């Protein structure tokens, strides 16, 4: 299994719609020329953006967090260019990009250093072979202060690993519960 380069990522995006919308270069400035957190193709990965759709965790219901019986009322939904995450809390978002993962490929997501250096951690489970959809992102604010996330700017990097052997059973074959998700998706069992 080897990590894939920018050439492979570009080819797969352009010929097989692996990433839509796709940016073949690194975007570091907005339309007005202001610096942003970069997104697009990097040497050995792809930096994704989060959309304007956020779910901010709140404890207004004083409930127990249970992944088997998750209460959607534990979130406040917002649509904005900026998301403020309360201290020691978290928020969910989704990528702008839609992914179609090849059957012989596994994708691992890592947070961007710009956010990590501010105490904001991005967590995403691997994108499995033949999974497709928009990725639900989890941002943890590990600081005792409110933290800001910017929509339509880079938030995480996807690394693509291609196996030397095609898997016997893909995520699609298993009927994975998050297959085809397009919005911010809460836990499912």
UniProtKB/Swiss-Prot annotation:
Short name of any one Pfam family annotated for the protein: DCD
Source species, domain of life: Bacteria
Entry binding sites for dCTP: 112-117, 136-138, 157, 171, 181
Keyword Lyase: no
Presence of keyword Kinase: no
Function: Catalyzes the deamination of dCTP to dUTP.
Name of the featured protein: dCTP deaminase
Organism, as annotated: Xanthomonas campestris pv. campestris (strain ATCC 33913 / DSM 3586 / NCPPB 528 / LMG 568 / P 25)
């Amino acid at each position: 299994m080897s990590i894939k380069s920018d050439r492979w990522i570009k080819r797969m995006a352009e010929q097989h719609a692996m990433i839509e919308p796709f940016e073949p270069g690194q975007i570091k400035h907005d339309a007005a020329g202001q610096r942003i957190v970069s997104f697009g193709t990097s040497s050995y990965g792809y930096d994704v953006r989060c959309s304007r759709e956020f779910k901010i965790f709140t404890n207004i219901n004083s409930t127990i967090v249970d992944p088997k019986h998750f209460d959607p009322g534990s979130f406040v939904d917002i649509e904005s260019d900026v998301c403020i995450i309360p201290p020691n809390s978290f928020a969910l978002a989704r990528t702008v990009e839609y992914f179609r993962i090849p059957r012989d490929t596994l994708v691992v997501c890592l947070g961007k250093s710009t956010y990590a250096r501010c105490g904001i951690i991005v967590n995403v489970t691997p994108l499995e072979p033949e999974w497709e959809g928009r990725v639900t992102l989890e941002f943890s604010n590990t600081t005792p202060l409110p933290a800001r996330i910017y929509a339509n700017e880079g938030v995480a990097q996807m690394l693509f690993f291609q196996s030397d052997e095609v898997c016997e059973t893909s995520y699609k074959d298993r009927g994975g519960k998050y297959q085809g998700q397009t919005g911010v998706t809460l836990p499912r069992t």
